[in-house]
Amino acid sequence: TAWDYYAFIRRVNLMLGRIDSSQMTEAEKAHWKSVGYFFRSYRYFSLLSAYGGVPWIDRVLSDNDTELINGPRASRDEIAKHILEDLQYAEQHINVNGDGNNTINRAVVQAFISRFCLFEGTWRKYHGLNDAETYLKECKRVSAEVMNSFPEICSNYDDLFCSLELKDVPGVILYREFSNAENVIHATSIGGTTGASYYNPTRDLVDSYLCSDGKTRWNSPLYKGDKDMYDEFSCRDHRLWLQVTPPYRIDRSASTDAWGNKWQFTEVAKDRSFIDSLNIRLGIGYGSAKERQKTLPFRQGYDGGILGAVPHFDFYLENQPWYKSAFGYNNWKYYCTYLSMGSQRNEETDMPLFRVEEVMLNYAEAMCELGEFDQSVADRTVNKLRSRANVAPMKVAEINDSFDPKRDLGNPAYPGDYAVNPLLWEIRRERRIEL
């Protein structure tokens, strides 16, 4: 549970309590205090988001500290204030470049301040609490600095989630490194590949992706309808094709059983249309061992089973009881050629923890909440992401009450519920799609 974080917080407090008595220089002491403050704040943010006010413990407790051990929790105001103060100290005192590659540095701290302050600022605004603007303005400040430090974004969205190394990928601020050789592995893609199919995208998620003209599926002339998945996925934000497995059908007749891996394209052009689109439009290969590419879904952790077709419904399995879905949509975000049949879930692709795209969207949302979002902000944030995804740029002047007929208009049955501002709705859509 989130309460287990206090064991980690105690370890951080042990380190912080002994830094001043060390033989380090004052600058080194300040740096390592900053690292400790970052990690303690990271855990306290999880506690704050789960519980609101919680006990604030900033030193190692003894058995005699009964007032703290048995005392009431601190208020949300106090916890949020401590988190921000610690992170602001860290921002000013941590080594600019950290302690080497992929370590906690100033940009990482600023990215975390951006994330925390947007959360806390909007929570306070929509729950009628004080100081919302303080946190939103701080989000605006640090986000702008991070964006200046990371002016480029990765040109290929898929590379962010399907790369063996994120070290040199533009816009990645901090990532979790994995390696089979070091026995540090993960199984991110496995949830959508087993017979259980633990999680699947929903229709609501698919509907939220814009058409390539920048309009919603509800009012774009490019939308071809949803009676056929090939039509549904046509002329859409390319990130949809990389999040949800696009439709295809292959010829598996050369495979003698469900586990066979022999396949070829059918003679029907439609069956391979999205395979070809991925290759031509996105520079992503499909089905052979090359850099930067997706791979056909297969039963990972076993000896094979290339999936013959998508959509693949759990009530129409075609003798292949895995990678199924009740909705017809499957996760594909982390599928790549670095996965292998029989791998027993030994995945070693790196995972981004902080990247500039999130910070850009934090900035956009904070600016909107502060009433400062305009076309120049859209061009600096949302539209940089859309250009990578083959979506027309956001034109702020065109976003009105009718832009998305499915926008949340609130429910009068619930006191205090409200209609979401159309512009804010579109910024939140971009966050949902990008992240």
Report the location of each language-model feature.
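Conserved, well-structured interaction surfaces
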Residues: 1-51, 67-81, 85-101, 227-229, ...
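An aromatic- and glycine-enriched ligand-binding surface/loop that stacks and positions planar moieties
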Residues: 1, 88-89, 106-110, 115-304
